[in-house]
From Swiss-Prot:
Pathway: Lipid metabolism; phospholipid metabolism. GO terms for molecular function: phosphate:acyl-[acyl carrier protein] acyltransferase activity. Belongs to the PlsX family. The lineage of its organism: Bacteria, Pseudomonadati, Pseudomonadota, Gammaproteobacteria, Chromatiales. It catalyses: a fatty acyl-[ACP] + phosphate = an acyl phosphate + holo-[ACP]. This is Phosphate acyltransferase. GO terms for cellular component: cytoplasm. Keywords: Cytoplasm, Lipid biosynthesis, Lipid metabolism, Phospholipid biosynthesis, Phospholipid metabolism, Transferase.
Length: 343
């Protein structure tokens, strides 16, 4: 029997706040009978949204009142100093104290990472936490990190990202010995900067990691690796570029099918295929970036997410909490450190 999982939700964060988080929470409770959710935010506002949604499962849904909200453009340092009663911080504090098994927020990414790192701390042996998300590929999906938390990384940092990504892919997505690839400007050993080359050496030496070598940008979408490792600058640019290209292709297809009567008829005939394609590349399906390397489960939802997308982030947080991903990462790092000391 599955034990109860409690998640704290930053109900005020993101572009839409409670209007997205509350319905997403109610839908998540229907999907997960063992789940208890805590909506963290301004109680009066949250109760209004619950009443509007005809909420009827109060036994597994509760509210934690707080008075402040972190703005989407607020500097992380200001959020840490001046927003100690914010919905984001209180939700993470619940993870720190053990009141919640994980937390989900659609709020300011920089403030979330800074607050999570300050409250939850990094795991022993992990220098920096990283942001990991899932990206659709020809073979299904791949997991990519870092996506913006660390602009400058050493080879050791990239190696740690590979370890964390492999553990999460195994535990949450059921992949056995996931292939870990380093994003690079070429597949040849001589290509890349010193940090990437050093990371490659460390990954090759580790028996804990199934290292797949260097992969180029197009290799991400061909499914050449289950986990793709890069620094946060490269990862964020690659992710945002991919989202832009997907939007461009969708718009081009829409324009072409509306060009004339013949193309409109073709569009009607192709509608089932187009709908299937849209589902496969719909970014909402892959919403929910994991903050790996912390002593607790924390998920970042896209700020503009709708209730369906936010619900996907909740689903990922449930799986990470069920599997105890932070503990699994800690155990893997301990084995690696022990192997280094014994070498």
């Amino acid at each position: 029997m599955t034990s109860q999982i409690t998640l704290s939700l930053d109900a005020m964060g993101g572009d839409h706040g409670p209007s997205v988080v509350v319905p997403a929470a109610l839908q998540a409770l229907e999907r997960h009978p063992h789940l208890h959710l805590v909506l963290v935010g301004q109680e009066e506002t949250l109760r209004e949204h619950l009443q509007a949604g005809n909420q009827g499962d109060s036994g597994r849904l509760s509210i934690r009142h707080c008075t402040q909200v972190v703005a989407m453009d607020e500097p992380p340092s200001h959020a840490l100093r001046s927003k100690k009663d914010s919905s984001m911080r209180v939700a993470l504090e619940m993870v720190k104290t053990g009141e919640a098994d994980g937390s989900v927020s659609a709020g300011n990414t920089g403030a979330l990472m800074a607050t999570a790192r300050y409250l939850l701390k990094t795991l022993p042996g992990i220098d920096r936490p990283a942001i990991m998300s899932t990206i659709p590929t020809l073979g299904g999906a791949t997991h990519m990190l870092d996506l913006g938390a660390n602009v400058d990384c050493t080879g050791e940092h990239l190696f740690q990202f590979g370890v964390m990504g492999a553990v999460a892919a195994e535990a949450v997505h059921g992949l056995e010995r996931p292939r870990v690839g380093l994003l690079n400007i070429g597949e040849e050993e001589i290509k890349g900067n010193e940090q990437v080359k050093h990371a490659a050496e460390l990954l090759l030496e580790s028996e804990e990691i199934h290292y797949a070598g260097y992969i180029e940008g197009d290799g991400i979408y061909k499914g050449e690796a289950d986990v793709v490792v890069c620094d946060g600058f490269v990862g964020n640019v690659a992710l945002k570029t991919s989202e832009g290209v997907a939007t461009l292709i969708s718009e081009y297809m829409r324009m072409e099918f509306r060009r004339n009567l013949l193309s409109k008829i073709a569009g009607v005939v192709a509608l089932p295929v187009l709908r299937a394609l849209r589902r496969r590349i719909d970014p909402r399906q892959y919403n929910g970036a994991s903050l790996l390397g912390l002593r607790g489960v924390a998920l970042k939802s896209h700020g503009s997410a709708d209730s369906f997308a936010f619900g996907r982030a909740i689903d990922t947080a449930v799986r990470e909490a069920e599997q105890g991903v932070p503990d699994l990462i800690n155990a893997r790092i301990e084995r690696l450190l022990g192997a280094k000391e014994g070498a």
